[in-house]
Amino acid sequence: MLNHRYAAWSEIALHGKDQLRQRVAFALSQLFVISDKSALDNSHLDIATYYDGLADYAFGNYRDLLEFVTLSPAMGVYLNMLGNEKPDEDNNIRPDENFAREVMQLFTIGLDELHLDGSLKIQDGQPIPTYDIDTVKAYAHVFTGWHFYGTTYNTWDNWWQNRNFRNQMVLVPEYHAQDVRKALLNGVVVEAGTDGERAMQMALDSLFEHPNVGPFVARHLIQRLVTSNPSPDYIARTAQVFNDNGAGERGDLGAVVKQILLDEEARQPLADQAPEFGKIKEPLIRGIQMIRAFGIYEPNTPKPQWYDYVFNQSPLSSPSVFNFFSDSFTPAGELNEMGLVAPELEIINDTYMVRNSNHAAWWSMWTPSTQEIDAGHERAMTIDFTPFISMLQNDPAELLDYLDLVLLSGGMNDTMREAILDYDQVAKEWLSDVERVKEMTFMVTGSPQFAVQR
């Protein structure tokens, strides 16, 4: 089932007509993390259902998305909210705090209070914590009594009879901590006696309305979509749109994504960008970009399923709830000294570099052309080199311009361009035209420039 899920994800990533929605969904999957490296290791249809939900809400409202995630049975299993029970001291039962902690730290507000531009608020020389252990306990009590759709008081302990990942979790009132007063964030208090459904809505509202959410979400989405080191002004402009889309709506993700992609900082010409602008491409995104650029896999054919081996990254397969990498990771050396972050470099190591280079060569140099496949035989991986050969024969620089456009977004510098054209001028003495195309492609896809998005 794992390979089927990867194949389905690949089909959408390579051939889906809603590429922006899918990119945003992938970014959200690294914020609202679940993973098959957990109790969900054999629940691949259920993980796929969760991902479909992220895509459905990618341009919707963040409050609705937060509720979808909270009541998702996949998330319930992953962070132990499903089956979470009210206190019972006689039986040593206390509400599980896992989801309560992560919904604050990782999904909405972070650890410390933020200004609109994402900078820390400081008091007496120290950051101001957003919550304490009492807050965690209060939310943990709110998140009790929820189980698989169809569960009742009588079937609570027989969870296998109710196993249902297609529908959102439901409240079983007898297991909810209704008799406990809960002091939440933003001055919200759930009084004792409040029913579990109402308590849940109050808790999610208290998180959604917190002033940290705008800059917290803005930074994450900017880092996944545009640049690792956005300026404070870029974050502030995006957070302001989160707070109000111009029509009085808070949390409009469609407006937020539009702001991120059309912001003046994102649209600057390469020559005008600050030196620190841009990001390392996630390994998985880099591989998908190359496959898409050359149509290596046709629609509705078998797709690659070995992402972890090649990229150190697979969809919804992070090693923990903290994602594949930290948004604040900085490698030792010059970037660290400059106070810059490069999150994606946390999963790029020597082994990955060798495997990535090998697979760049495999895809660009050793993938057969459609003309090389004998009639009557099927091969999932092929490239039709005809248009590329035509460009090469017309002018090698024309082919290189195309590779520059689709792989480097027009960012190839003169030194790289001259080196590739000089090599081709010599290599054409012993290489066929199709071999020249393959070698030029590998020189681009194997380059450091291809690893960077600017």
PLM-predicted stretches and their roles:
Residues 13-17, 39, 43, 92:
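Short secondary-structure transition/capping motifs
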Residues 4, 8-19, 26:
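Structured, charged N-terminal subsegments at the starts of enzyme catalytic cores
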Residues 1-9, 43-303, 451-454:
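Active-site substrate-binding loop specific to GH73 endo-beta-N-acetylglucosaminidase modules
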Residues 18-21, 32-37:
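Short, contiguous, well-structured surface segments enriched in hydrophobic/aromatic residues
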Residues 26, 63, 438:
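Residue-level detector of short, conserved catalytic/binding motifs and their immediate flanks
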Residues 32, 210-214, 218-247, 258-454:
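Flexible, low-complexity segments enriched for small/polar residues
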